[in-house]
UniProtKB/Swiss-Prot annotation:
Protein name from the UniProt record: 4-hydroxy-tetrahydrodipicolinate reductase
Species annotation: Burkholderia orbicola (strain MC0-3)
Gene Ontology MF term list: 4-hydroxy-tetrahydrodipicolinate reductase; NAD binding; NADP binding; oxidoreductase activity, acting on CH or CH2 groups, NAD or NADP as acceptor
Reactions listed under catalytic activity: (S)-2,3,4,5-tetrahydrodipicolinate + NAD(+) + H2O = (2S,4S)-4-hydroxy-2,3,4,5-tetrahydrodipicolinate + NADH + H(+); (S)-2,3,4,5-tetrahydrodipicolinate + NADP(+) + H2O = (2S,4S)-4-hydroxy-2,3,4,5-tetrahydrodipicolinate + NADPH + H(+)
Pfam families on file: DapB_C, DapB_N
Domain of life, source organism: Bacteria
Key words, A-Z: Amino-acid biosynthesis, Cytoplasm, Diaminopimelate biosynthesis, Lysine biosynthesis, NAD, NADP, Oxidoreductase
InterPro entries membership: DapB_C, DapB_N, DapB_N_CS, DHDPR_bac, NAD(P)-bd_dom_sf
Residues engaged in binding (S)-2,3,4,5-tetrahydrodipicolinate: H154, G163, T164
Described function: Catalyzes the conversion of 4-hydroxy-tetrahydrodipicolinate (HTPA) to tetrahydrodipicolinate.
Pathway assignment: Amino-acid biosynthesis; L-lysine biosynthesis via DAP pathway; (S)-tetrahydrodipicolinate from L-aspartate: step 4/4
Organismal lineage: Bacteria, Pseudomonadati, Pseudomonadota, Betaproteobacteria, Burkholderiales
Designated gene of the protein: dapB
Binding site for NAD(+): G7, A8, S9, G10, R11, M12, D33, G96, T97, T98, A120, A121, N122, M123
Ligand binding (NADP(+)): R34
Amino acid sequence: MKIAIAGASGRMGRMLIEAVLNDADAQLVGALDRAGSPFLGQDAGAFLGKDTGVKLTDDLDAVFAQAEYLIDFTRPEGTMAHVEAALRHDVKLVIGTTGFTAEQKADLQAAAARIGIVFAANMSVGVNVTLKLLEFAAKHFSHGYDIEIIEAHHRHKVDAPSGTALMMGEAVAGALGRSLDDCAVYGRHGVTGERDPSSIGFAAVRGGDIVGDHTVLFAGIGERIEITHKSSSRVSYAQGALRAVRFLSARGAGLFDMQDVLGLR
């Protein structure tokens, strides 16, 4: 599997590079970084003390010409440029970027008519199994329970609520036969009035080096149930991304997510 990594100098990019280098079936063939990055020209394995022969570059076409797959955990504007390059070079994509607009998501859907794409806000096996637990719980706590989602991430995260929190909200709303767009409440301030019993609330915490904590609270009268997933390392995301690459190796064009990759549908 000839794999290139986008955002190669970032926290997630470095974890992905390490995972690829440690996988006997994978070959690192490219490492992309943003224009102007001080790491351009550096060996992709330098932070591991390894010489890979792959230099960080901002030349999209040079990298895509070598790759079969690109793993991308960057930002929406960068990812959309990578999608265009992938279409030019027929490269399959594993996308863990969050914060897309509705229009950008539509563009991803259109691109998937020509290339294979796994798009998931969280590639952890644990998170995706948690989504199934939430669907089950929501069906049994559909009456008399208020639903709130609380997430916490490191101080550098730029979007809120997290993509994973939104996935959890969509899983719960879908199980209840609702649209998240119609029932989500993002943060509260001032005099908000009494809680709408059909709403799903979101709260976001940012601080320190928190990798990612997510709790879905079902609060009833006399009891409350909390379903929590905590990430202590980005290793789980990197391993999930490699599972997604293997999944795409046996697939043609189409838009998939980790529920497809893990056979949880």
